[in-house]
Amino acid sequence: MNAYEWIQSVVLFAVLLLAIKPMGSFMAKIFQGDRTFLSRLLVPCESFIYRVCGIDKDEEMGWQQYAWALLLFNLICGVALFFILLLQGVLPLNPQKFPAFSWHLALNTAVSFMTNTNWQNYGGESTASYFTQTFGFAVHNFLSAATGIVVAIATIRGFVRRRVSKIGNFYVDIARCTLYLLLPVSLVFAVFLVSQGVIQNFSGYRTVPLVQATSYLKPKLDATGNALKDPKGNSITETIQVKEVTIPMGPVASQEAIKELGTNGGGFFNANSAHPYENPTPLANVVEVFLMLLIGGSLTYTFGVMAGNTRQGWAILAVMLAILVTAVGTLYWAETSGNPLVAKLGVHGVNMEGKETRFGVAGTSLFTSAATGTSCGAVNAMHDSMTPIGGMIPLSLILLSEVVVGGVGTGLYTMIAFVVISVFIAGLMIGRTPELLGKKIEVREMWMSIITVLTSGILVLIFSGLALVVPSAVSSMANPGAHGLSEVLYAFASMSNNNGSAFAGLNGNTIFYNVTGAIAMFLGRFAPIVASLAMAGSLAQKKFIPASLGTLPTDKIPFALWLTLVILIVGALTFFPALSLGPIVEHLIMLGGK
């Protein structure tokens, strides 16, 4: 790295660490019902919402009631978005006259935004109207993020509370999360992004002539959207000449802020955060990385504050950041090492294919690692154009169940599941009943943790295997061999883990991928949520056990190292065979010069 790249990285993580404590403390106040500096302004709004919706803010729920309320709320929101997409053609704020989504694309997209995945089998600027973007996607960016956060808070309450059956009120939690946390922070950073050049308007698209006409080759597609191929298996192309270009407009800044803050990731434009209207400057790029990591990282401190042991929160954060920094460094090394196949053609240097020159390799490595370590899934470069090892880094971060730092809320409750598993295994090794924060870890907690951790892995392997044998799914693959396998594996890893990023080269807008993807996203989101809430309900009913000489300290460096090892071992045992057939084989082929 040069001096600028070092400064960029160091300043980012330094500012993040400085923000963890105040933001974590602020969130603890929000969810403990304490007054904050926003209370004077927002309490009337909060009370109005409760009054209109008939919510008793003092009535709490058991874990089953909390889970049912969460599922019902999200299903209603998802169905509403589904019909917005089906009726897009007749709804207002559609200056480009975009037609309705097909039923299977509407299903996939509605589930995608409902589950905080933001997987997009469409191009935003060529498919979605301003009404859809604003009242459909942007609204769900807030609500899906809030859903993940409140599940993490409910899980924390399971450790904090003693001999009770209640873990909070879902409706109160999601209202306070949206009002006091997501809306104010998004507003501040939306204004900042506008200052950097991100657009915010409802104007129609603008068509302007090019100074010089250009042409490019475009693959021909059949009626189903799949690439046509000649008898030798090569794609059939046609030459397209371009004399003018249409510049899309739209309310981008307001959606961009919550897209990163809520680790949603769905781009207003097809190019996502590589587009200059979403991410125009290197400073905006670093700030967007900061937003991705802010809430997920700060929730670890919230955990420590609410549990009465802030060192526990710092220990979990240290594990998250250690893996993240390692991923950033490995990705940077892989991309700066270049491609030996290209070097043979006389093109030496770093691999800049698919990257924006305003960000460079360092800015791309930071953004890519943060977006896949969290559940954000935003991209500022083409992941498919990275070297095999470079592409394996974001894939591996997703496959680790996104605990680095993880999505807002999802990262923490998944990491807590890993902590429970680590404590349980360590307890078996030393012959002690496992304990965590004064609560016994027994069979029920272990089962719920296993469901939380392994659900996504099971979905990835089942659906990836299915996609490699179903003819209609195989026809969606534009690349054969190891790279084609990597693309399929990445797609279902991204959907099952609610990430949303993708490798190119795979036509996902088919009935097979839209329907199976919707199933993977739904189960990958809500099975771990229900399991985490069930664990919280079980823990809340247990008595507190004071620490003794035989208690395993979980806030010290040895346990942090043990937790890191468990996370990596679970990921390796689950996915190493698949990675061996995909990016690892592809890397060996590249080194072999083939």
Swiss-Prot record:
Transmembrane segments: 11-31, 67-87, 136-156, 179-199, 286-306, 314-334, 411-431, 450-470, 517-537, 559-579
Localisation per UniProt entry: Cell inner membrane
Top-level taxon of origin: Bacteria
GO molecular function: P-type potassium transmembrane transporter activity; potassium ion binding
InterPro entries reported in the protein's UniProt record: KdpA
Membrane topology: Multi-pass membrane protein
Biological function: Part of the high-affinity ATP-driven potassium transport (or Kdp) system, which catalyzes the hydrolysis of ATP coupled with the electrogenic transport of potassium into the cytoplasm. This subunit binds the periplasmic potassium ions and delivers the ions to the membrane domain of KdpB through an intramembrane tunnel.
PANTHER family for the chain: POTASSIUM-TRANSPORTING ATPASE A CHAIN (PTHR30607), POTASSIUM-TRANSPORTING ATPASE POTASSIUM-BINDING SUBUNIT (PTHR30607:SF2)
Subunit structure: The system is composed of three essential subunits: KdpA, KdpB and KdpC.
Protein name: Potassium-transporting ATPase potassium-binding subunit
Organism field: Citrifermentans bemidjiense (strain ATCC BAA-1014 / DSM 16622 / JCM 12645 / Bem) (Geobacter bemidjiensis)
Gene transcribed to yield this protein: kdpA
